[in-house]
From Swiss-Prot:
Keywords, in A-Z order: Chaperone, Cytoplasm, Stress response
Protein family: Belongs to the GrpE family.
Organism expressing this protein natively: Methylobacterium nodulans (strain LMG 21967 / CNCM I-2342 / ORS 2060)
Gene name as annotated: grpE
An example Gene Ontology CC term for this record: cytoplasm
BP GO terms, sorted: protein folding
Subunit: Homodimer.
Lineage: Bacteria, Pseudomonadati, Pseudomonadota, Alphaproteobacteria, Hyphomicrobiales
Protein name: Protein GrpE
GO terms assigned for molecular function: adenyl-nucleotide exchange factor activity; protein homodimerization activity; protein-folding chaperone binding; unfolded protein binding
Compositional bias segments (type: Low complexity): 192-218
Presence of keyword Cytoplasm: yes
């Protein structure tokens, strides 16, 4: 400490004056209005950012929950897809065994042959019920409109009396599991007939030729003057 500092410290302050050292120590920590506004804006921006992050996290969790539920449901529904596809060959062979016996011979069968045919038919029904129990359904499109999502056209059958694009013969039964095609139905499709929209339209008055103007109520001639 220099002699001047000692002299200043010992010198009494004027009445009403405040010691600068005490004033600096006791003054509250205040910010200018502009600085306060900047701090509030920064806090608001941080709060908004955290809120957006929270909402995105909640949305991601909800999407994950739904996706997981869908995947679990699909796994439960389609877990037997490969096994069911292999069993379709068994169902086809059972049907072929029954179809190999003419209807009249099947009706006249008795004894061991009748028991054998009944057993094959019962096996086919039980197999179909078992497949249905696991979500596998047969597609029987006979008489329906051809759908490329469910059917596979093998040939065309000329038939002017049937709407064009109608399934007129089923070569092999199709199957679906859930909402997926397990095997498309092999079909024959009609051609040469009316279009489906025209075939479903009820018969009515023939349409007038385009551009024909309507006729007036009278004969269109000016009456003769008396």
């Amino acid at each position: 400490m220099t002699p001047n500092d000692t002299e200043n410290a010992a010198r009494p302050l004027p009445e009403g004056a405040v010691d600068p050292a005490q004033d600096a120590a006791g003054a509250p920590d205040t910010l200018a209005p502009a600085a306060q506004a900047d701090a509030v804006a920064a806090l608001e921006a941080e709060k908004l950012d955290l809120k957006n992050k929270l909402l995105r996290a909640l949305a991601d969790m909800e999407n994950l929950r739904r996706r997981t539920e869908r995947e679990v449901a699909d796994a439960r529904t389609y877990a037997v897809t490969n096994f069911a596809r292999d069993m379709l060959n068994v169902a086809d062979n059972v049907r072929r065994a029954l179809d190999s016996v003419p209807v009249e011979d099947r009706a006249a069968a008795d004894g061991a042959l009748k028991a054998l045919l009944d057993g094959i038919e019962l096996t086919g029904r039980d197999l179909a019920k078992t497949l249905e129990r696991h979500g596998v359904r047969a597609v029987e499109p006979q008489g329906q409109r051809f759908d490329p999502n469910l059917h596979q056209a093998m040939f065309e059958v000329p038939n002017p009396d049937v709407a064009n694009g109608t399934v007129v013969q089923v070569v092999q039964t199709g199957y679906v599991i859930g909402d997926r095609v397990l095997r498309p139905a092999l079909v024959g499709v009609s051609k040469g007939g009316p279009k489906a929209a025209e075939a479903s339209k009820p018969a009515g008055e023939a349409p007038k030729p385009a551009g024909e103007a309507p006729k007036p109520a009278g004969d269109g001639q000016k009456p003769a003057e008396a």
